[in-house]
Swiss-Prot record:
<protein>
    <recommendedName>
        <fullName>DNA-directed RNA polymerase subunit alpha</fullName>
        <ecNumber>2.7.7.6</ecNumber>
    </recommendedName>
</protein>
<keyword id="KW-0548">Nucleotidyltransferase</keyword>
<dbReference type="InterPro" id="IPR011260">
    <property type="entry name" value="RNAP_asu_C"/>
</dbReference>
<dbReference type="InterPro" id="IPR011262">
    <property type="entry name" value="DNA-dir_RNA_pol_insert"/>
</dbReference>
<dbReference type="GO" id="GO:0003677">
    <property type="term" value="F:DNA binding"/>
</dbReference>
<dbReference type="GO" id="GO:0046983">
    <property type="term" value="F:protein dimerization activity"/>
</dbReference>
<keyword id="KW-0808">Transferase</keyword>
<feature type="region of interest" description="Alpha N-terminal domain (alpha-NTD)">
    <location>
        <begin position="1"/>
        <end position="233"/>
    </location>
</feature>
<keyword id="KW-0934">Plastid</keyword>
<comment type="similarity">
    <text>Belongs to the RNA polymerase alpha chain family.</text>
</comment>
<keyword id="KW-0240">DNA-directed RNA polymerase</keyword>
<dbReference type="GO" id="GO:0009507">
    <property type="term" value="C:chloroplast"/>
</dbReference>
<feature type="region of interest" description="Alpha C-terminal domain (alpha-CTD)">
    <location>
        <begin position="267"/>
        <end position="337"/>
    </location>
</feature>
<comment type="function">
    <text>DNA-dependent RNA polymerase catalyzes the transcription of DNA into RNA using the four ribonucleoside triphosphates as substrates.</text>
</comment>
<dbReference type="GO" id="GO:0006351">
    <property type="term" value="P:DNA-templated transcription"/>
</dbReference>
<keyword id="KW-0150">Chloroplast</keyword>
<dbReference type="Pfam" id="PF01193">
    <property type="entry name" value="RNA_pol_L"/>
</dbReference>
């Protein structure tokens, strides 16, 4: 464990790691400070950073497992102590580290008797296991166990929709969140107008990356979110009789989608749900009512299509562009191969 005495700077804004430790292979802890900040800035940064740490950082998980000749998820296999469901739950807990894009295949092929652990997983070269001792199953008889696995890198929490299991393939709910928890606290010092703040940020990770790495990645993601505002062209907005009435330059969501089709990224668009964006409740409910659930659905609509929806206004179109931070959606997740 590393611990340093906190020293407050009164000059240039700076951050420092004041505590760092590894409680286990799958639990890392780090505490950081940022100072000096003006009154109110610590809370602004702390809230944004916590949300970025918990929701914007990508992780790698096992998302599907395929067994041979298994009728359903709650089946038992002769010679294996656990049911198929219990094995799936154990696979869900496996912590992986990778730099892959998209999905990869992996497998388990072992012969009993004996315990099956994470070290028995045959992985692609771009993926590694954080803790080889993680338990999967116990083979009580000399049988062969072969499981095909699918590995994905993504972010957030994905609940898999059950489909046809006749091929023995079972989806696994995936938690693509390498940061287990993040907290922030504020210490104020000084008097009157000279009052300043220190931001304390605590980060716990699952071992697939360190708290310091998580802090760097979350910071980069936050910066990427705001870059479009720095380079945005001056909007062609003007007020008419009603000061809240907004006229937008001509555009269509469909035109922008055409460019994405050229890069064959529609699958990624379908995995981004409008729930992930902070749309006003009225706008959100209106989109859901017309079966617009994902970014792909939304980008497939023109401005005219949206305006035909009941109770939908031109101000709502503008709000969608602002809330979705559309430039990040086009230039960040879909430009990598």
């Amino acid at each position: 464990m590393v611990r340093e005495k906190v020293r407050v700077s009164t000059r240039t804004l700076q951050w420092k790691c004041v505590e760092s430790r590894a409680d286990s292979k799958r639990l890392y802890y780090g505490r950081f400070i940022l100072s000096p900040l003006m009154k109110g800035q610590a809370d602004t940064i702390g809230i944004a950073m916590r949300r970025a740490l918990l929701g914007e950082i990508e992780g790698t998980c096992i998302t599907r497992a395929k067994f041979e000749k298994i009728p359903h998820e709650y089946s038992t296999i002769v010679g294996i102590q656990e049911s198929v469901h219990e094995i799936l739950m154990n696979l869900k807990e496996i912590v992986l580290r990778s730099n892959l894009y998209g999905t990869r295949n992996a497998s388990i092929c072992v012969k009993g008797p004996g315990c099956v652990t994470a070290q028995d997983i045959i992985l692609p070269t771009s993926v590694e296991i954080v803790d080889n001792t993680q338990y999967i199953a116990n083979l009580t008889e000399p049988i062969n166990l072969c499981i095909g696995l699918q590995i994905e890198r993504n972010r957030g929490y994905h609940i898999k929709t059950p489909k046809n299991f006749q091929d023995g393939s079972y989806p696994i709910d995936a938690v693509f969140m390498p940061v287990r928890n993040a907290n922030h606290s504020i210490h104020s010092y000084g008097n009157g107008n000279e009052k300043q703040e220190i931001l304390f940020l605590e980060i716990w990770t699952n071992g697939s990356l360190t708290p310091k790495e998580a802090l760097h990645e979350a910071s980069r993601n936050l910066i990427d979110l705001f870059i479009p505002f720095l380079h945005a062209e001056e909007e062609n907005l003007h007020l008419e009789n009603n000061q809240y009435k907004v006229t937008l330059p001509f555009f269509t969501f469909h035109d922008r989608l055409a460019k994405l089709r050229k890069t064959k990224k529609e699958i990624a668009l379908k995995s981004i749900f409008i729930d992930q964006f902070e749309l006003p409740p009225r706008t959100y409910n209106c989109l859901k009512r017309y079966n617009i659930h994902t970014l792909f659905d939304l980008l497939n609509k023109s401005q005219e299509d949206l305006m035909k929806m009941e109770y939908f206004r031109i101000e709502d179109v503008k709000q969608i562009l602002d809330s979705l931070e559309i430039e990040k959606a086009f230039h960040n997740p879909f430009t990598e191969e």
